[in-house]
């Protein structure tokens, strides 16, 4: 705000920022963590959709089993992993602590559990592929065990980060509620 003639008005040169209020760190952290969790939820939804598509195509016999292999047992239970993601999406808009806790617990049960079982279930087939170079199940011409191990690796990372960021977000929310109780 400069005048046509004369000096600039005091307080308009940008030096008046020190008296302004700042956003508390736990609110900043909450926004950042919510953003990360939303990205991870979307990544999980993509992985879940791919697994669901394979199970659906196989069960409905839409294509030959030579093109898309029949699913492993762990893939059926992994389909329940959409439940934690739904609870996570429901928890974020209103900072609902109980939904976030349900999401974390069910994430361990429905996400990490089937992934660990799947790694053990497919290990003999992967070992046979590595030692002898023979694969008996294929997905679009690629070894099914190789593709599903790739899915497992991606899923472990996505779910691990989901649980980690959810715990940090829960801590940020508890900091906020503890501050309110003190006042």
UniProtKB/Swiss-Prot annotation:
Q: Where are the transmembrane segments?
A: 40-60, 72-92, 100-120, 138-158
Ranges per topology, Lumenal = 61-71, 121-137
Its membrane topology: Multi-pass membrane protein
A Pfam match: Jagunal
Give residue ranges on the Cytoplasmic side.
1-39, 93-99, 159-183
Give the main location: endoplasmic reticulum
Subcellular location(s) per record = Endoplasmic reticulum membrane
Q: Which Gene Ontology cellular component annotation is one that this UniProt entry carries?
A: endoplasmic reticulum
Keywords, A to Z, come to:
Endoplasmic reticulum, Immunity, Membrane, Protein transport, Transmembrane, Transmembrane helix, Transport
GO biological process terms, alphabetically, are: defense response to fungus; endoplasmic reticulum organization; granulocyte colony-stimulating factor signaling pathway; neutrophil differentiation; neutrophil mediated immunity; neutrophil migration; protein transport; vesicle-mediated transport
The family annotation for this protein states: Belongs to the jagunal family.
Described purpose of this protein according to its UniProt entry: Endoplasmic reticulum transmembrane protein involved in vesicle-mediated transport, which is required for neutrophil function.
Q: What is this protein called?
A: Protein jagunal homolog 1-B
UniProt source species: Danio rerio (Zebrafish)
């Amino acid at each position: 705000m400069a005048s046509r003639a004369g000096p600039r008005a005091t307080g308009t040169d940008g030096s008046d920022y020190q008296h302004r209020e700042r956003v508390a760190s736990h609110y900043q952290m909450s926004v950042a963590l919510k953003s990360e969790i939303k990205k991870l939820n979307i990544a999980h939804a993509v992985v879940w959709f791919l697994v669901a598509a394979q199970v659906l195509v196989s069960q409905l016999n839409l294509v030959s089993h030579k093109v898309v292999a029949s699913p492993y047992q762990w893939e059926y239970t992994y389909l329940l992993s959409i439940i934690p993601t739904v609870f996570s999406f429901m928890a974020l808009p209103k900072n609902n602590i109980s939904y976030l806790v349900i999401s974390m617990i069910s994430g361990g049960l429905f996400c990490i559990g089937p992934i660990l079982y799947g790694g053990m279930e497919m290990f003999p087939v992967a070992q046979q592929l590595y030692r002898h170079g023979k694969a008996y199940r294929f997905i679009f011409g690629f070894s099914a065990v190789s593709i599903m191990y790739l899915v497992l690796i991606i899923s472990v990372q996505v779910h691990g980060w989901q649980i980690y960021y959810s715990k940090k977000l829960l801590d940020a929310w508890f900091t906020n509620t503890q501050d309110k109780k003190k006042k």
